[in-house]
Amino acid sequence: MVLGHNERMSRQPRWPVAAGLIAGVALDALIGDPRRGHPVAAFGRAAAALEARDYADSRRRGAAHAAACVLAVAAPAAALHRRTRGRPPWQAITVATAVWAVTGARSLHFEAERACSSLRRRDLAAARAVLPSLCGRDPATLDSAGMARAVVESVAENTSDAVVAPLFWGAVAGIPGLVAYRTVNTLDAMVGYRSARYLRFGWAAARMDDVANWIPARVTAALTAACAPLVTRTSPVSVLNVVRRDGGRHPSPNAGRCEAAFAAALGVRLGGTNVYGGVTETRPDLGDGRAPEPEDIRRAVLLSRAVTVSATALAVLAVLAGDWRLYRRMKKPTTKTISATMATHHSRCSANPAPNRARMTSRARSKSNIVGLLLKPDWLTSTPGGFVKHLE
């Protein structure tokens, strides 16, 4: 049977994507982000240059800017993804490279542990120097407890943004999903603020990021609840109850779920007053525990690592489940397959009718002889020679 181009493409196995997801996460864990020449940093510089040309205090101009940035990166990624389909080694390599480029688990955990060490030494100046690499808050306004809370909240939110969400979109859409998601998330980090400059211009980027993270944030909360007994011995049910109660109270439709899950799992209370670029925001409390301490940062990192492993396994299983469905579909004969087989048989019979008629005549004659033997039982008393004659 000859398959159409679209059908052949849909039947390509996706196990190279699964292999690439595993290899990319392993690469990030082993070598982390490069100090120079990181692809995301290069995109950030290009987006900043484009913003300087496109900026206007307008939602429409901001939406055009966000769309142009996403398309400029996602279109080549889609072409590369299409080119490597049907070439498993190359597809696995390109997916692994993309996963390594867009995930940031190692950097997140490393910076959080640096802040934890500084706070445990009571070196507030060193902790304030680390904080800008984790969040956009003004470190000068924070004391030790405020910085501990800021780091725990950053670990919770970025576990979703920098780990779970890229893996989710990589499992769903391969290289284009990975690259497009990181583009949207980077734009949100650059212009998605409620400041006077970006309130209108950054609106589209912020909404795109909300949509892209809606499912991953809830997956992160569920995985945090599942991993909580391993790290903090907290009941998953109690974590989910806090997420259900407090997650929607956060200004962000996604970050609140992740922060509420970490707060419940760690037994701390998150939320409060934050200062972003001179703008003060007061957020509701998440969780029922005490105020975070430096030691809670270390526990948050352990929990984030457990969620990273779980999210990788879940993404790989989701991709392989698609391959299993493809295998079952290819084994099961479809209506098209049956119709094609019948058409082939009919064409063969039409092309060479004489042997078929002879074969049918021979079968009819044999059937007639057998019926005659059954209707004339005198052969039972005849000689062996007569019996042979009847069969002939």
Can you say where each PLM-predicted feature lies in the sequence?
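Short amphipathic, positively biased membrane-proximal segments
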Residues: M1-A343, A351, L373-D378, F387-L391
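Intrinsic low-complexity, disordered N-terminal segments enriched in polar/charged/small residues
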Residues: S368, W379-T381
